[in-house]
Structures are given as structure tokens and as C-alpha cells.
């Protein structure tokens, strides 16, 4: 057999082993892992700023319109002229609406200023889940408060416009149209502020559900 001679083969496969005293250490390449607090929706921060800004504007409009709703008129009943003086401060429901609109506007303004401060420092708008939970709680509280205030004021405005059935109490909005119109627009703005605060709460939930 010519292929084997003197204990050697014609084709030799050599394997070089490391010396006995040497140590081989395999160092894996380090993988750079970067984490970012930005949620799955990159424009979610822009939507959050927009909803809070609109909620603040609606609350300010509700407050300013209700405060300016003052008017004097004359109501004629059976030929008797009765002077009327309509003012938002005469009703506890309208006072509650003004107070809650002011508080809601201040809350939204504080959140916008905080977001602007973080934008200047180039830090995340919502740095932690705890902060997101606080935002969610605040948005929920003020949204429900604006709904409650708007509903109470709407009951008073509807009573002024329609009067009381089965009684001789007339429609006060006929001699006081400006007061009733401003009150109605103010109440509508309050409900819009409630809607945008509720939208902010939904955005907070989306932020919390982000990985």
C-alpha cells in the first residue's frame, strides 16, 4: 500500500495546539444597548402639548366670558315693569364654574411651563411612570371637575331661558339676552375644556402602555 509508509501518510492534516502553560481568553464584543424613554408614538409629546394648550384656552375663555356676563334689563309682567340685574356672582353654580375654570387653566398652564422647561433642558417630557401616573390623576380630577361645574351652570342657564313650568315665572333671557348668550358660550367652552382634559388623560394611558 503505497499511501502509507514509515508511519506517515501522504496528506497530513496538522492541528496546532496552544502551549500547555498558555491561557486563551475569548472576549466577546460588547454590544451597545441604548434605552430611550420615547414611546412607540414619536409625536405623542406634540399631541400632549396641543391638548393641554387647547384645554387651557377653553378654560380661560369660559372664565372670562362668565365674568363678563352682566346685564340689566326690565321685565314686564301684567303691565308691571320689574327691573332686573343679572350677574354671575348671584349664582353659586356660576361661581363654581368660574372657580373651576380658573383652577383648570392654572393647572394646564403649569403643565405647559413644566414641559417647556424640560424641552429647554432636552429632557423627556414624561421622565418616569410615576410622573405619568400623576399626570393621569390630575387630568382625570380636573376633567371631572369641569364636567361637574359645566353641568351645574347649564342647569341654571336652562332655567333662565325656559323659566319654570306651571308657574308664572317668565323667560328671563328675553330682557337679558347678552347675559344668557355669554353664559351659554362660557358653559360650552367649559365642556370643551373637559373634553380636551379627558383627551390628555387618554394620552397619559397610551404613554403608560408604551414599553
UniProtKB/Swiss-Prot annotation:
List the stretches on the Extracellular face of the membrane: 67-95, 153-186
- What InterPro entries does this protein map onto? CASP/CASPL (IPR006459), CASP_dom (IPR006702)
Please give an example of a GO cellular component term from this record: plasma membrane
Chief location of this protein within or outside the cell: membrane
Q: How does the record say this protein sits in the membrane? A: Multi-pass membrane protein
> Assembly state and interactors?
Homodimer and heterodimers.
Q: What is this protein called?
A: CASP-like protein 3A1
Source species: Sorghum bicolor (Sorghum)
Upper classification of the source organism reads:
Eukaryota, Viridiplantae, Streptophyta, Embryophyta, Tracheophyta
Amino acid at each position: 500500500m503505497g499511501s502509507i509508509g514509515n508511519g506517515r501518510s501522504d496528506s497530513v492534516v496538522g492541528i496546532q495546539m496552544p502551549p500547555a502553560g498558555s491561557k486563551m481568553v475569548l472576549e466577546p464584543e460588547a454590544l451597545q444597548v441604548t434605552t430611550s424613554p420615547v414611546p412607540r408614538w414619536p409625536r405623542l409629546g406634540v399631541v400632549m402639548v396641543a391638548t393641554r394648550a387647547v384645554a387651557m384656552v377653553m378654560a380661560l375663555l369660559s372664565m372670562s366670558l362668565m365674568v363678563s356676563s352682566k346685564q340689566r334689563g326690565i321685565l314686564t309682567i301684567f303691565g308691571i315693569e320689574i327691573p332686573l340685574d343679572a350677574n354671575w356672582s348671584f349664582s353659586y353654580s356660576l361661581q363654581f364654574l368660574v372657580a373651576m375654570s380658573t383652577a383648570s387653566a392654572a393647572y394646564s398652564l403649569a403643565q405647559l411651563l413644566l414641559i417647556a422647561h424640560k424641552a429647554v433642558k432636552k429632557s423627556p417630557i414624561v421622565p418616569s411612570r410615576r410622573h405619568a401616573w400623576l399626570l393621569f390623576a390630575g387630568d382625570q380630577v380636573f376633567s371631572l371637575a369641569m364636567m361637574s361645574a359645566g353641568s351645574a351652570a347649564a342647569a341654571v342657564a336652562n332655567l333662565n331661558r325656559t323659566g319654570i313650568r306651571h308657574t308664572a315665572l317668565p323667560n328671563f333671557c328675553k330682557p337679558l339676552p347678552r347675559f344668557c348668550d355669554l353664559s351659554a358660550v362660557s358653559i360650552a367652552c367649559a365642556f370643551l375644556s373637559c373634553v380636551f382634559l379627558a383627551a390628555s388623560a387618554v394620552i397619559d394611558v397610551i404613554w403608560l402602555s408604551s414599553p
